[in-house]
Amino acid sequence: MELDFLTQNAIIYVLIAWVVILIIAKLLKLENHGFQIKAYSLTYKNTQVQSALSKMLTRTKRGIRVFADVSVVAGFLMMGFAFWFLLTNISNFFVEPTEFAELTVLIPGVTLTSASAILYFLLSIPIVLIVHEGAHGIVATLEKIKIKTGGFAIFIAMFAGFVEPDEDDFDKAKKISRLRVIGAGATANVIFAFALGLLLLTNPFFALILPEPMLGWFYEAPDGV
């Protein structure tokens, strides 16, 4: 069944879905299980995040240490690239408008209106958040910075993940430790993206299950077919 009916008035369907989510959350009494429910948001906090990360760290401590050090360098490189891209893009807007790359926030029902785009977004956002926030958390644990809570939040059609470090611990930590924690999230996302891209490029099986809009990014149809 085609999902193109969502393309028109997508924001209405998103709002309806949000109301349904709130009703289900209330019926399941999720407030008793770490959730905070408001008309515009659904937030989950867990105080046991660090204990789970500590168990992971016992098996991967050496690798995480290397990753944490790489994150410091990668963080500065990505920050430099972001400034370069921003300045170049602003310059293009005035000097070469055809080269200007429009940027927008991805919001289901607002900037994402097709059914396929919303579906891909909803499938990918949990992975991105888990990788990103998990990296922050495990490096903070490595640096012996206490994590008070970890969790996620949904603001109608916008999503967020978080690990909440103890502010005193974070402020008292060495500068290099703070840089490792800060750089870990974005670095983890970049590494994951490259690893996934490599997997797609080297395993033809994925061509069978990859969505059509993404297929052309990784594969070319052979001539004569």
For each predicted feature, which ranges?
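Hydrophobic transmembrane alpha-helices and their immediate loop junctions
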Residues: 1-225
